[in-house]
């Protein structure tokens, strides 16, 4: 059995860990980073993922996709998607199934498909680190993700070639890492403010048991919103100072502003003031325009004060659901890059009445916990019990459009709950089961997870048939619903997948595309390596020819130069085999060149001809003419 990796699939950055023995270990990417930007870019020739995609975003804004996690499991017409469209330099559309998708070069990509590209890179990085194929993973999601968003994440894993052994809530993963090997019993609050989402979870940790008491949050609140406030401020100030020029209409300028806003936000976590300096940001008939502006921490805090305040109400609700007060919380653990912001830390301290615990790395602790969960599933980590909860209530629509709950929010999972219903009309031949998730009293105000029909009900007066509806939530938080006519024993069930999400056929098609792309990547890597090797061989050979000058045999020189010309002509070709063959031929000819070089050195004599390694043996010849000197030690 191979390793089960732990992946934190983040809005802004992603991270991957693995258990090595009893210790979780961070897997660095080839660029040397411990986290990888959750960015995918498309160029005319290739697809880029991670740091390399982020670096070219300014020059390629419309084809560089970031923060796609915000679109996972959402409909194209959802209000949150509409808000994101206003600020996004890339094009967001409704896919064929109605879900939010990204359109690049005329082709729509679903959110799970883009996420799969990020997961595919993390998988490849893990394989390079471990030296073995990786097929299994534990992937984290925000605790307040609904069923559609969880299913979309699982689909992304499948497309990337990963068997997702468990979907685990991010605060739960963080608490697992925090509580790993801790014996003391503690009530902790995990305050998780990341790039795109906010979660608060109340847990009991100790003696290798992690039990979630309650969770709450906002799946559309995070660092991207803070960045946007800075961008809007910079755009407004620039417009005011430059005769109404609107940078928001220039996608390339907008991308530069985004990078500057992110940097300024980070700088102001450690300094009181920073300067935003973007020369040649745009131009008009009078010439180029430059953006130079100072931004203070006080100004930033004023811009984002309401965003920070939005984290408070979920904290209150989570504490109430857990039946605890802020004073009963032993530790507040900060997770997510945004918790580095002093204003966030100050508000957390004020609400909970204590300084937050900063002992964990907010960027990595979630992936670390996912790896520990992978170790538990693989049997490598023993005696650790994890008890998670479902974040939202589940139920069905009943007469009058009422939402009838079967499973209350913060119920420990996995769980199963049944309830008996009846018909609303005489001789009703079927019932429609409308499955919903949410907290509002009316069905229309909650999120539809799915619908299915139970048919073949025998004619009877209303109120007579007995229809048992059962909800089953697995450890991933994914829902199965069944309806059974207790009179006939007839049963109908549905496994809830992402609402209007990817069908099985679509997933299989995307899996095949991802595999084909992986093969293409491998071939591309082979081509790059062959070209680099050939280029190095050409350089070395030409240098040797120059060094030998007219001492080189004319016929041999002509033969080698012919082979160099032939190989150089192949450097831009896509034929790996031809490049390798020409490289081998040049290498063989170069061996003769080396032989001639050594022969000439031997004939010439001198230090090069009989040179020995440095040290005693090589130093003796020179020492023959050295006179030993007498000396007297002078005592002080």
Swiss-Prot record:
Acidic residues bias (residue ranges): 625-636
Comp. bias regions, Low complexity: 600-616
Region (Disordered): 597-636
Pfam families: HSP70
Modified residues (Phosphothreonine): 197
Keywords: ATP-binding, Chaperone, Nucleotide-binding, Phosphoprotein, Stress response
HAMAP family: DnaK
NCBIfam families membership: PRK00290.1 (NF001413), PRK05183.1 (NF003520), prok_dnaK (TIGR02350)
Name the record gives this protein: Chaperone protein DnaK
Organism listed in the record: Nitratidesulfovibrio vulgaris (strain ATCC 29579 / DSM 644 / CCUG 34227 / NCIMB 8303 / VKM B-1760 / Hildenborough)
Encoding gene per record: dnaK
């Amino acid at each position: 059995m191979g390793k089960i990796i732990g992946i934190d699939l983040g809005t802004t950055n992603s991270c991957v860990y693995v258990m090595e023995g009893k210790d979780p270990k961070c897997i660095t990417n080839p660029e040397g980073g411990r986290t990888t930007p959750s960015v995918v870019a498309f160029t005319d020739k290739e697809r880029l993922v991670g740091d390399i995609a982020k670096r070219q975003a300014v020059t390629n804004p419309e084809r560089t996709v970031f923060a796609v996690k915000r679109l996972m499991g959402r409909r194209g017409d959802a209000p949150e998607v509409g808000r994101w469209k206003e600020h996004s330099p890339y094009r967001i559309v409704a896919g064929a199934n109605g879900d939010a998708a990204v359109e690049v070069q005329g082709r729509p990509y679903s959110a799970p498909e883009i996420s799969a590209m990020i997961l595919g890179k993390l998988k490849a990085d893990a394989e390079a680190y471990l030296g073995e194929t990786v097929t299994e993973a534990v992937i984290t999601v925000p605790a307040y993700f609904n069923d559609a968003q969880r299913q979309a994440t699982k689909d992304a894993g499948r497309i990337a070639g990963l068997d997702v052994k468990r979907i685990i809530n991010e605060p739960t993963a963080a608490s697992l890492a925090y509580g790993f090997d801790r014996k003391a019993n503690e009530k902790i609050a995990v305050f998780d403010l990341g790039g795109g989402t906010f979660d608060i979870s109340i847990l009991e940790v100790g003696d290798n048991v992690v039990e979630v008491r309650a969770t709450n949050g906002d799946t559309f609140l995070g660092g991207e919103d803070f960045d946007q406030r800075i961008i809007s401020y910079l755009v407004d100030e620039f417009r005011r100072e430059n005769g109404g020029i609107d940078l928001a209409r220039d996608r390339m300028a907008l991308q530069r502003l985004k990078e500057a806003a992110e940097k300024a936000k980070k700088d102001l976590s450690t300094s009181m003031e920073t300067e935003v300096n973007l020369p040649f940001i745009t131009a008009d008939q009078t010439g180029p325009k430059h953006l130079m502006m100072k931004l203070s921490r006080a100004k930033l805090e004023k811009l984002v004060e309401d965003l920070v305040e939005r984290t408070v109400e979920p904290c209150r609700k989570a504490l109430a659901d857990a039946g605890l007060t802020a004073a009963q919380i032993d530790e507040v653990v900060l997770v997510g890059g945004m918790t580095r912001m002093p204003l966030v830390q100050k508000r957390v301290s004020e609400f909970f009445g204590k300084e937050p615990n900063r002992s964990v790395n907010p960027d990595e602790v979630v992936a670390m916990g996912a790896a520990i969960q992978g170790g538990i599933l693989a049997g490598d980590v023993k005696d650790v019990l994890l008890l998670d909860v479902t974040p939202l209530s589940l139920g069905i629509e009943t007469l009058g459009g009422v939402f009838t709950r079967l499973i209350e929010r913060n119920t420990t999972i996995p769980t199963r709950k049944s309830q008996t219903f009846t018909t609303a009309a005489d001789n009703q031949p079927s019932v429609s089961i409308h499955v919903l998730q949410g907290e509002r009293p009316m069905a229309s105000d909650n999120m539809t997870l799915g619908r299915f029909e139970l048919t073949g009900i025998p004619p009877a007066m209303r109120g007579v048939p007995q229809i048992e509806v059962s909800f089953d939530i697995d450890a991933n938080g994914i829902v199965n619903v069944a309806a059974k006519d207790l009179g006939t024993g007839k049963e109908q069930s549905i496994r809830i997948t992402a609402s209007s999400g990817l069908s099985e056929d679509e997933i299989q098609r995307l899996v095949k595309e991802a595999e084909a792309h992986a093969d293409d990547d491998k071939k591309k890597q082979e081509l790059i390596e062959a070209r680099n090797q050939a280029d190095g061989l050409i350089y070395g050979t030409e240098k040797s020819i120059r060094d030998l000058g007219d001492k080189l045999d004319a016929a041999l020189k002509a033969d080698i130069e012919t082979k160099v010309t032939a190989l150089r002509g192949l450097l831009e070709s896509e034929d790996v085999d031809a490049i390798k063959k020409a490289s081998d031929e040049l290498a063989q000819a170069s061996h003769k060149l080396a032989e001639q070089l050594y022969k000439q050195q031997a004939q010439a004599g001198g230090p090069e001809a009989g040179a020995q390694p440095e040290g005693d043996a090589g130093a003796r010849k020179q020492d023959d003419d050295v006179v030993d000197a007498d000396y007297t030690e002078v005592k002080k």
